[in-house]
Amino acid sequence: MEKFTKHTGIGVPLRQSNVDTDQIIPAVYLKRITRTGFEDALFSAWRKDSSFILNQEPFNAGSVLVAGPDFGTGSSREHAVWALKDYGFRAVLSSRFADIFRGNSGKQGLLAAQVAQDDIELIWKELENAPGTQVTVDLESKTVVCGNIVAPFEIDDYTRWRLLEGLDDIGLTLQHEADITAYEATRPSFKPKTLPAKVS
């Protein structure tokens, strides 16, 4: 997983609250067997409307989504995070996230930054008044900068550490590779063993 320290990109004002995972990516797209290529599925129902924010320039090139409260509610769906990342988003700002979405985001390298709703409102106005405005999300200082607006954001220390180090679940496991190898070397031969992956 790529490390996240600081990202600057076009901000996208999504004035919508209670955006659930089925709105982020409808269930029909969950039949795919790969982890990539979901950008066409992101907000697919809403993108049929020509006035939707991602159908407008320069917002269609955005990488920082500024959403309303209660983003990512509904079912646990890693595909929702994959779709956001495949489209090009690196961070989502909201005053409240569903816990399961926040957890999935941190494991996949998408920053879910919890920003006070008053600051979200100010950022929305800035982005709407000056489309194409860049938003900088700095994970080290836990701040968001948009024009003259500087706002703090909240994120738990563990998720912040994982993002700064670029550690997904596999990366975390591989930090203990030497211990795992040493344990398996002493494990009785009649017990199951982990075999190396075959590369073809």
Curated annotation (Swiss-Prot):
Is RNA-binding tagged as a keyword? Answer: no
- What superkingdom does the record give? Bacteria
**Cysteine pairs bridged by disulfides in the record:** none
| Top enzyme category | lyase
Q: In which pathway does it act?
A: Amino-acid biosynthesis; L-leucine biosynthesis; L-leucine from 3-methyl-2-oxobutanoate: step 2/4
Q: What does this protein do?
A: Catalyzes the isomerization between 2-isopropylmalate and 3-isopropylmalate, via the formation of 2-isopropylmaleate.
Subunit structure, as described in the record: Heterodimer of LeuC and LeuD.
What the record says about family reads: Belongs to the LeuD family. LeuD type 1 subfamily.
Annotated protein name in UniProt: 3-isopropylmalate dehydratase small subunit
The record lists the organism as: Pseudarthrobacter chlorophenolicus (strain ATCC 700700 / DSM 12829 / CIP 107037 / JCM 12360 / KCTC 9906 / NCIMB 13794 / A6) (Arthrobacter chlorophenolicus)
Q: Which gene encodes it?
A: leuD
